[in-house]
């Protein structure tokens, strides 16, 4: 069963000039006559679908079925340009209409009603029955009930005239003008993803129409550029190309489904596959296009992310928007409250925390002042502060020199060097510099892409980078941020009484050293087996900062090996050096007593012991003006402690020397409840375990372990060993400087130098000497380590003897032994000496095994 839906087409009332436009030949007139006598348009739709819908109780609206139903008393008009046409997915007018224009159903119906029957020229009795929007095409199908005194042709003509008149009143009518066309066919209401095109495809279900007939039928909807009639290969398809989208859209919606001489016309938009210049370039020139694409992506990433990274680095240095104590406003508030609380404490006789460390640093006040003075000088500031581990380099710079200074960047080389993987290294470097955002995973992706492109095109894209280049880029970006901070208050022109003066950037930086940020690079060693490039990159970067005069740079190091690296970066620069050593015995004692003052007082009070009440700090200062404030807390501690307790503390401090970190650890242990002697014994035991794990365990190289044990024995007996005594030791003869410097870099010893020449060898810190003695006095441990050392010496001497014996073999075959008597005597003496060493070592091993 087929459902036949008809649409009355009163052809006899159509204007003849409109239908006959462009037809000039007899054949065209003959076919036109046939067109005039065409039957009403018919589109066959299966009735089974409608029956199924009715049985299921579903709607049969045009939106759901794609078919418009109307009676003979109704006329169907298509209004175009009601919505924005979807000619492209990225058409901006769609968003404009969606956001700024009222597209509700009532608003559209009111607009159609005003166009068809305006108040100033109404069609009396005209009723708008329904509207069916086709937003993709930008139009609306409107069904009107024809008034009794009008015919359909008259109503259609009046609606067209009113629409043309009303839509042309707007100032923007050229763009917003609407048109009304009677629907001759049976339109198919579909919302498929078929975007409008200027070309429509006509499929003939029956004999094809001629070009004249096609022109006559479709010309009224817009200017036609060309008509492509059916071909021999495809004799039932024709194409019509319009100049504008409006013509093609109106023709498709008004004519589709019309039947002429038993031929039904089905019209759709042509699916045009436009050739894109960019896609063609990438398809046809792969070897060039892919590198160009990655280059463009890199440029885009730089343009977008580099300003963000520079801002984040500035934030890391200035802490302008940070809520930490490094923020400028928090620093001012902290200074104000700190000074206020200090005054209150002093008034009530409380302790002043600002002086608890002063006596330890009295011997370094001059160096702190020198460092502050260097930072205020106009000359390039390149400072190297060297001191043993735990000597207080970090506190000297960060707490005593730069505590209240703005714009400080602190870099810890140790965190960078110890990064095991490339992503972890990049994350640590970015965290140190404030470099954000960073995408470590991109390196893995770009590496795979680089290999893929190289396999396809034979050349690399250059997109993948090594961690060295990435780190160098981070430093370059940081340099730009530091320069911006240094020149923040710079003005190219300064007004004076005599006029305007042009100020150069170099002159401004020379006159305002306080504006330059301070870069502190801690734990700079100069060499490393893993990530050793960090030292070179940092030294080159620091040299550039100093040469550009945009920052002060301070290096904190433990050894002199860093000087060689820095000299390579700045060969003509004279470094400002600060050498830090351990505190004196008196200052160490004063520091510990000042830290333990309150603890000792309240500890004795809690035990019920009689404690002599010390005078308040204020009374002490008033009664004894000759004493400094720094000695006040020490005198309090001496009053609280008896002579025996003071002697115990003095004896406990003897192994610690003046190393600040060890003194702080000792104070913490005592405050936790340990006796001074117990605290120092545990520290010595802990240091000995550390030495054993780092230098004397089975996992360590046997030669290195034997060298370490030999130095431990010597340093346990003597606080200082001259370097020339080590040169003659068996295990150091081959490369004495290399062995000593390796142990120094690993933190077992420290070596003093005179113009680069090794002079004296000491333990890395005073506590190590007590740890050396502890290891020597431990019979079981000393027996194992001593035996291992002696076996290494025996092996070393045995190897030397074998080498000499190999040399003696050819000499023994010479007939005249007198020719090489001198060499033979030399080798014989060497072998005898080594034999004596081996014999001695074996005797010691035998004694140790008893």
Swiss-Prot record:
An example GO CC term for this entry is: mitochondrial inner membrane
Q: Which GO terms describe its biological process?
A: mitochondrial genome maintenance; mRNA processing
Per its UniProt record, what Gene3D superfamilies does this chain match? 3.30.70.330
Check the record and name the CDD domains matching this protein. Answer: RRM_Yme2p_like
The stretches that face the Mitochondrial matrix side, renumbered to this chain, are 45-287
Q: How does it sit in the membrane?
A: Single-pass membrane protein
Which ranges of this chain reside in the Mitochondrial intermembrane compartment per its record? 309-850
Q: Alphabetically list the UniProt keywords.
A: Membrane, Mitochondrion, Mitochondrion inner membrane, mRNA processing, RNA-binding, Transit peptide, Transmembrane, Transmembrane helix
Q: Where do the segments described as Disordered lie?
A: 44-66, 607-633
Compartments reported by the entry = Mitochondrion inner membrane
Q: What is this protein called?
A: Mitochondrial escape protein 2
Organism annotation: Saccharomyces cerevisiae (strain ATCC 204508 / S288c)
């Amino acid at each position: 069963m087929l459902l036949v839906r008809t649409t009355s087409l009163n052809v006899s009332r159509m204007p003849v000039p409109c239908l006959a436009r462009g037809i000039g030949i007899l054949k065209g007139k003959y076919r036109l006559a046939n067109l005039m006598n065409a039957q009403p348009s018919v589109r066959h739709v299966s009735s089974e679908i409608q029956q199924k819908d009715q049985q299921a109780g579903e709607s049969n609206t045009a939106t759901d079925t794609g078919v418009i139903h109307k009676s003979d008393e109704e006329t169907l008009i298509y209004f175009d340009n009601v919505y924005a046409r979807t000619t492209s997915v990225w058409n901006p007018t769609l968003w404009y209409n969606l956001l700024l224009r009222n597209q509700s159903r009532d608003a559209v119906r009111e607009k159609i009603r005003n166009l068809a029957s305006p108040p100033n020229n109404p069609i009396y009795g005209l009723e708008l029955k329904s509207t069916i929007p086709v937003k993709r095409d930008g139009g609306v199908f409107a069904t009107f009930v024809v008034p009794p005194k009008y015919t359909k042709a008259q109503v259609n003509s009046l609606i067209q005239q009113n629409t043309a008149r009303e839509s042309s009143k707007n100032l923007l009518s050229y763009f917003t003008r609407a048109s009304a066309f009677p629907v001759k066919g049976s339109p198919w209401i579909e919302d498929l993803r078929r975007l409008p095109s200027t070309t429509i495809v006509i499929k003939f279900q029956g004999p094809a129409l001629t070009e004249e007939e096609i022109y006559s039928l479709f010309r009224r909807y817009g200017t036609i550029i060309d008509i492509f009639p059916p071909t021999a290969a495809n004799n039932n398809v024709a194409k019509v190309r319009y100049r504008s989208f409006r013509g093609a859209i109106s023709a498709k919606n008004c004519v589709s489904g019309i039947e002429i001489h038993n031929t039904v016309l089905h019209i759709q938009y042509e699916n045009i596959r436009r050739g894109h210049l960019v896609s063609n370039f990438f398809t046809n020139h792969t070897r060039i296009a892919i590198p160009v694409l990655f280059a463009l992506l890199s440029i885009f990433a730089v343009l977008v992310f580099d300003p963000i990274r520079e801002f984040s680095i500035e934030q890391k240095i200035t802490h302008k928007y940070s809520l930490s104590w490094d923020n400028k406003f928090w620093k001012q508030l902290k200074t104000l409250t700190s000074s206020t609380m200090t005054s209150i404490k002093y008034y009530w006789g409380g302790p002043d925390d600002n002086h608890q460390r002063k006596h330890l640093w009295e011997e370094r006040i001059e160096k702190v002042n020198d460092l502050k003075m260097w930072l205020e000088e106009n000359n390039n500031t390149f400072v190297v502060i060297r001191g043993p581990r735990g000597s207080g380099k970090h506190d000297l710079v960060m707490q005593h020199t730069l505590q209240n200074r703005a714009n400080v960047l602190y870099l810890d080389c140790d965190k960078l060097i110890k990064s095991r993987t490339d992503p972890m290294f990049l994350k640590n470097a970015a965290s140190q510099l404030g470099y954000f955002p960073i995408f470590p995973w991109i390196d893995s992706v770009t590496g795979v892409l680089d290999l893929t492109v190289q396999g396809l095109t034979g050349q690399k894209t250059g997109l993948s980078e090594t961690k060295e280049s990435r780190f160098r880029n981070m430093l370059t970006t940081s340099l730009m941020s530091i320069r911006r901070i240094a020149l923040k208050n710079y003005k190219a022109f300064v007004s004076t009484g005599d006029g305007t003066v042009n100020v150069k950037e170099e002159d401004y930086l020379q006159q305002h050293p306080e504006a330059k940020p301070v870069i502190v690079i801690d734990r700079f060693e100069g060499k490393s087996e893993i990530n050793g490039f960090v030292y070179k990159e940092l030294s080159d970067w620091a040299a550039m900062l100093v040469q550009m005069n945009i920052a002060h740079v301070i290096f904190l190091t433990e050894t002199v090996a860093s000087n060689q690296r820095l000299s390579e970066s700045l060969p003509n620069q004279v470094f400002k050096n600060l050498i830090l050593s351990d505190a004196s015995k008196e200052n160490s004692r004063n520091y510990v007593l000042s830290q333990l003052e309150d603890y000792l007082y309240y500890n004795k009070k809690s035990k019920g012991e009689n404690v002599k009440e010390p005078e308040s700090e204020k009374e002490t200062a008033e009664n004894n003006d000759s004493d400094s404030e720094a000695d006040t807390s020490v005198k309090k501690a001496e009053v609280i402690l008896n002579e025996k307790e003071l002697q115990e503390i003095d004896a406990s401090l003897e192994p610690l020397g003046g190393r600040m970190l060890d003194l702080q650890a000792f104070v913490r242990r005592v405050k936790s409840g340990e006796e001074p002697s117990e605290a120092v014994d545990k520290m010595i035991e802990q240091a000995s375990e550390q030495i054993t794990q780092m230098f004397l365990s089975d996992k360590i190289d046997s030669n290195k372990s034997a060298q370490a044990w030999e130095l431990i024995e010597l340093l346990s007996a003597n606080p200082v060993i001259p370097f020339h005594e080590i040169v003659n030791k068996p295990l150091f003869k081959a490369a004495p400087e290399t062995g000593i410097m390796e142990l120094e870099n690993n933190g077992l010893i420290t070596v003093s130098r005179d113009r680069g020449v090794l002079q004296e060898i000491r333990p890395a810190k005073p506590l190590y000497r007590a740890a050396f003695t502890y290891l020597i006095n431990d019979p079981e441990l000393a027996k194992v380590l001593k035996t291992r050392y002696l076996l290494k010496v025996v092996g070393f001497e045995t190897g030397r003897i074998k080498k000499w014996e190999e040399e003696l073999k050819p000499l023994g075959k010479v007939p005249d032994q007198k020719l090489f008597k001198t060499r033979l005597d030399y080798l014989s003496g060497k072998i005898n000496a080594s034999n004596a060493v081996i014999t001695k070592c074996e005797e010691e091993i035998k004694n140790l095994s008893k």
